[in-house]
């Protein structure tokens, strides 16, 4: 929308209603002697609360999608604050329920007006499904949940392993790129290699839970 340069809109006494599904009832905030650190912490908690809706959204001022990379970090912060495990589970199930025919997990999901997986696929974002599942089990052990979602996690690992040669070296796929950072002015192969090692260790622990020896 646009207006005439000779006219402008003016709002008098505007009000804003904020929404969150974050539960403050059991939340005990941390206290720091350093006032700057305290302010950073308080703003961080408020931002997490603003992103805590039907899912962990990608920021209240952004596109409000559910991104797997963001979910991993938001879930970790959630365990140290509001500790709403049901919301983490909901997000994991959303991703698990909307894989491609090949079994790939989308990097993000639109949740309004209906749940729709995006057609963006990123190397480490699919792997972070494993990380988020592992972190949840570390915070709140749930073998039944692991058994139910393990096949999806294993599928992500198997798909990704096809990108490595017999010497364990990553062969990048432009259709399944390593993200790491918005900049494309540097080689991301080493970062992808490190991410795979990081997630592989977590996957092995999940495999032990379900007693998968393969």
Regions found by a protein language model. Name each.
Residues 1-6:
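Short beta-strand-plus-loop segments that form exposed binding edges in beta-rich domains
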Residues 77, 135, 163, 202, ...:
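Amphipathic, soluble alpha-helical interaction motifs
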Residues 7-161:
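Substrate-binding groove/exosite segments of carbohydrate-active enzymes
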Residues 105-119, 174-189:
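Acidic/His metal-coordination segments adjacent to aromatic residues that form catalytic metal sites
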Residues 161-168, 175:
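Aromatic-lined carbohydrate-binding/catalytic grooves of carbohydrate-active enzymes
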Residues 55-56, 166-169, 206-213:
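Surface-exposed helix-capping loop/turn segments at secondary-structure junctions
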Residues 186-214:
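Active-site neighborhood of glycoside hydrolase catalytic domains
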């Amino acid at each position: 929308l646009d207006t005439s340069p000779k006219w402008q809109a003016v709002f008098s006494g505007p009000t804003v209603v904020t929404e969150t599904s974050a539960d403050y009832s059991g939340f005990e905030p941390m206290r720091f002697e350093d006032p700057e650190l305290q302010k950073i912490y308080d703003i961080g908690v408020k931002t997490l609360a603003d992103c805590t809706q039907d899912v962990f959204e990608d920021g209240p001022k952004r596109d409000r999608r559910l991104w797997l990379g963001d979910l991993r970090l938001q879930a970790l912060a959630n365990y140290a604050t509001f500790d709403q495990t049901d919301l983490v589970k909901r997000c994991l199930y959303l991703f698990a329920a909307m894989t491609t025919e090949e079994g790939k997990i989308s990097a993000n999901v639109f949740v309004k007006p209906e749940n729709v997986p995006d057609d963006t696929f990123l190397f480490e974002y699919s792997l972070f499904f494993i990380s988020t599942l592992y972190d949840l089990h570390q915070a709140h052990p749930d073998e039944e949940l692991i058994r139910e979602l393990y096949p999806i996690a294993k599928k992500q690992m198997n798909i990704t392993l096809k990108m490595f040669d017999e010497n364990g070296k990553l062969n990048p796929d432009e259709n399944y790129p390593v993200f790491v950072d918005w900049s494309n002015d540097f080689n991301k192969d080493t970062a992808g290699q490190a991410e795979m090692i990081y997630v592989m260790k977590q996957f092995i622990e999940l495999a032990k839970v379900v007693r998968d020896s393969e």
